[in-house]
Amino acid sequence: LTTKLFCGYCGALMFGESVITDHITAAMPESPSVKRLVSVGPEAPEGFEDFHKGIEAAAPFVKPEHPNTNDDISLMYFTSGTTGEPKMVAHDFTYPLGHIVTGSFWHNLKESSLHLTIADTGWGKAVWGKLYGQWIAGANVFVYDHEKFTPAAILEKIQDYHVTSLCAPPTIFRFLIHEDLTKYDLSSLEYCTIAGEALNPAVFETFKKLTGIKLMEGFGQTETTLTVATMPWMEPKPGSMGLPNPQYDVDLIDNDGRSVEAGEQGQIVIRTDKGKPLGLFKEYYRDANRTHEAWNNGIYYTGDVAWKDEDGYLWFVGRADDVIKSSGYRIGPFEVESALMTHPAVVECAITGVPDEIRGQ
């Protein structure tokens, strides 16, 4: 993310580190939208307002220039794309309500719960698991911002603070199952959810064998809230994301826009012809072209490919641009990776297509 790009979206900037303010000052000639520069450091550099002096001089109440509406932008995330600069995902004030399902149902939280989500604060997943849905459910939230991840440290925190609910990417659980779990008292842990990447069945089975806990998978994007999930009342199918969240009209479609049948692959889409559902983003900020590419004619295209079984469960294949096409077959990297992960010598693996003159890839 370039300083120029970031400043181009802002009306006011607040920074404290001198090395950052130097970059900001250099970017100002190409950032006409910035009207105010504010320093929160001990001394305001030339051209910056002093934040602390401004607070002291400010009136106790200032009437807003315009009343807020549900449609106003409440927060924005950066999300990387496969090409070009990162996209800025804008959500409106209905976004937190979209996470009621996340906290109360997928995380299965009660007022007595102590929930831990492992995600850096700057990620969209942080508010998925540390803020909106959990607070709406009235649950307690345990925040652990580790400088360096170690499986032992996570297990110690669960033991010492009696964490009851844990949400983390599958990679975290891949490390946990290689620890000696008998060294820790994990009796408080009741429920575990995973998101951020597809779950290999081997990890599901091993963790269940060691702890007795089933990993409940979920799928969503920075642009959405929980979109597909295995809920508490559902029987998980290892490797499957689960069923669509009822708050979204989820479908799988082929390149011709046709809804696919069971066993067929299709892109995961959200139909919005009847209205924008709670939790779906408002737009890619100041980028009408990218917004239209992803969301047009009453359909939001996630860019992710899956297939569904006879029970309606969705199985992740990969990004639409990551699917390997070989000899006329469409091969999902996750399927091959899951097979490799069953070997005890394999901790992590990644599959990608290589150009081939005969097979295509």
Residue ranges, per PLM feature:
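Conserved pre-ATP/AMP-binding loop-to-beta segment of ANL
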Residues: S39-E46, E56-F78, E85, N108-L114, ...
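Conserved ATP/PPi-binding loop(s) of AMP-dependent carboxylate-activating enzymes
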Residues: Q247, R258-E293, I331
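AMP-binding/adenylate-forming catalytic core of the ANL superfamily
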Residues: L1-F6, G11-S18, L166, R290, ...
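Conserved AMP-binding/adenylation subdomain of ANL enzymes
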Residues: L97-L114, T121-T164, E179
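Conserved loop-to-beta-strand segment in the C-terminal subdomain of adenylate-forming
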Residues: P32-R36, E264, P355-Q361
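Gly/Ser/Thr-rich phosphate-binding loop
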Residues: K53, I136, V163-A168, I177-K237, ...
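Structural core segment of the AMP-binding/adenylate-forming
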Residues: L1-K53
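Conserved AMP-binding A3 loop
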Residues: S74-G98
